[in-house]
Regions:
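Short alpha-helices
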Residues: 2-53
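Hydrophobic helix-and-loop "lid/oligomerization" segment in the mid-to-C-terminal part
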Residues: 32-183
């Protein structure tokens, strides 16, 4: 069986400014109420990340509150590691703006260029499946160092973000030239 929720066409779903993750979280909240459990609060930080990354309208009080509470209570180790890796560009302050312009671009670049296996690693990292150890040999070094999945993902994020930027910089003059020829 499947549960299908479409907040855009349902008369019973009040928040039209929520992303799919937020709607799923609302469903988890309802299940928590029904079964007397409390799983929903542990993933509120990821709901905030999804609402920000999907560029959702935060005029909805529910969406805004979810973002504010989620960013104030970061529980997910992968999300926390990404934030720490961007501490300099974020000036040590976690805001929706800083997440949108420092965290989201890293994740997006990675997802655009990563292999299927690397995407599975990212899912494992966000799910806290962190038993795997990776070996990495720095440029100019002889001996490899060991890194956990979170360190490994940050290195991949940074690498793919740089690669994406180089691809953009290489393509931009070509696109500009084509645009000038057309207009």
């Amino acid at each position: 069986p499947a549960i299908i929720l479409n907040n855009q066409i349902s008369d019973r779903y009040y928040n039209k400014n929520a992303c799919g993750t937020h709607i799923t979280w609302d469903s988890i909240r309802a299940l928590d109420d029904y079964y007397w459990t409390d799983y929903n609060e542990s993933c509120l930080d990821l709901v905030a990340l999804a609402n920000i990354s999907d560029n959702m309208n935060i005029t909805s009080m529910s969406t805004r509150a979810t973002i504010n509470i989620g960013l104030s209570n970061i529980n997910n180790t992968m999300f926390d590691t990404i934030i720490k890796s961007q501490e300099y560009s974020m000036k040590g302050i976690v805001t929706p703006h800083n997440v949108a312009f420092s965290v989201t671009p890293l994740i997006n670049a990675f997802l655009r260029l990563a292999t299927f296996e690397e995407r599975v690693l990212l899912m494992n990292a966000f799910c806290g499946i962190d038993h795997e150890v990776f070996e990495y040999t720095k440029r100019g070094e002889v001996f490899p160092i060991e890194e956990n999945i979170y360190e490994h993902m940050i290195r991949l994020f940074t690498s793919y973000r740089g690669k994406q930027n180089r691809m953009r910089d290489k393509a931009l003059p070509i696109l500009m030239k084509e645009a000038e020829q057309q207009y």
